[in-house]
Amino acid sequence: MQLSLLKAKIHRATVSHSELNYEGSIAIDGLLLEAAGLYEFEKVHIWNVTNGARFTTYAIRAEHGSGIISVNGGAARYVQVGDLVIVAAFAQMSEDEAAVFRPNLVYVNAANAMTHTNHSIPTQVA
């Protein structure tokens, strides 16, 4: 059986640009792309924390260290500059692979500078 697990997440990034007439995609600061282990043109899910919108697109590289998170093309209609978003990607793997797999979790500040990384999420308590 193949399972779909969270591969990577960039948590609560701030949309810095929104380019409706640019060819589709989300441009992500190259430093964040690498820290998350995301590839250019990889399918990513975007979850807008600010307005609840959810959509998929593909990642492209923005300038390394620029802090750019730019939602482009038709997807630009789902965000506004300043919105908080989560960028996530999933990977298919066997049960044996899933038993030892840990995702790349990247956390950023309001300027989209990486603050820290992790490979697990704390247990939620009441």
Curated annotation (Swiss-Prot):
GO terms for cellular component: cytosol. SUPFAM superfamilies: ADC-like. Keywords: Autocatalytic cleavage, Cytoplasm, Decarboxylase, Lyase, Pantothenate biosynthesis, Pyruvate, Schiff base, Zymogen. It catalyses: L-aspartate + H(+) = beta-alanine + CO2. It is found in: Cytoplasm. It holds the Pfam family Asp_decarbox. It is an enzyme of class 4 (lyase). Substrate binds at residues 57, 73-75. Catalyzes the pyruvoyl-dependent decarboxylation of aspartate to produce beta-alanine. It comes from Xylella fastidiosa (strain Temecula1 / ATCC 700964). This is Aspartate 1-decarboxylase. The active site is at 25 (schiff-base intermediate with substrate), 58 (proton donor). Binds 1 pyruvoyl group covalently per subunit. HAMAP family: PanD. Its EC number is 4.1.1.11. Its cofactor is pyruvate. The modification Pyruvic acid (Ser) is found at residue 25. Belongs to the PanD family. Heterooctamer of four alpha and four beta subunits. Pathway: Cofactor biosynthesis; (R)-pantothenate biosynthesis; beta-alanine from L-aspartate: step 1/1. The gene is panD.
